[in-house]
């Protein structure tokens, strides 16, 4: 046993135990194109085997942010990996790409195999939902950088799309209909404000139960995994129905919807056209946050906004319903230069 490294606070044996525990979770994410298993210096993927004509790779990386604090307080680590995958693959699918593979990075103060297995099991769950293979990762034990019960989680994904089917919003026109796909709740953005409003200002704890949240523990509601939209959106891409997609993450509607719009166009969003999960009202009241500012911070119940030609909206809604996805007509595209998003 490498005693000197152990004395420095790094457990080599615990690292071996983590690898042993996660192998079965990694195996269930296997998909066509995967060449190598975990354990090599890099993960191998055979793009040629998938039959693309003009493949364009789209990459994305993200983390979970301070939602990890809620996981720590609840001592619940089996879904936070889904959040990590979702934050990455939802960005990639917003440009029309099918996620192919994923890699994770975990940094911790002390290597706890039981906790890290829970984290990676969630990553694997997210990969299965997204159709992406978990082909590699890194677990870094960093005593002195993190407390023993702390860890950080980030991920990286690569997806692929035919060049002719890239979704970049360039064909969006005034009159296009905006369809919203519901979120599961807060997802993984805004948790610094969430914690300040709920725990500091309102004095709640993760174990507080509120009637407006069906008496569920607040921490349980906040840990609801970020929704993965890959399987809902891919049929729309295959039918060439989508002109643009906005992933509603940090910055809410105000920052994210304009990212898909050409210059000179804006989004007119009809408030009340979709249900807003009650957790947002709880946060707004607890933190005394201006109602309209909430739309500049959170997803407010919509994780994706999709631009569709008016004459193809019914077709898109039918495909979404067939995929088991509830969708709402939430607005339309207008000609406007100054304000890029109208919320009314």
UniProtKB/Swiss-Prot annotation:
One of its GO terms (biological process) is adenine biosynthetic process. Pfam families: AIRS (PF00586), AIRS_C (PF02769). It catalyses: 2-formamido-N(1)-(5-O-phospho-beta-D-ribosyl)acetamidine + ATP = 5-amino-1-(5-phospho-beta-D-ribosyl)imidazole + ADP + phosphate + H(+). It comes from the Bacteria. SUPFAM superfamilies: PurM C-terminal domain-like, PurM N-terminal domain-like. One of its GO terms (molecular function) is ATP binding. It comes from Bifidobacterium animalis subsp. lactis (strain AD011). This is Phosphoribosylformylglycinamidine cyclo-ligase. The keyword Transmembrane helix does not apply. It is an enzyme of class 6 (ligase). Keywords: ATP-binding, Cytoplasm, Ligase, Nucleotide-binding, Purine biosynthesis. Belongs to the AIR synthase family. Its main location: cytoplasm.
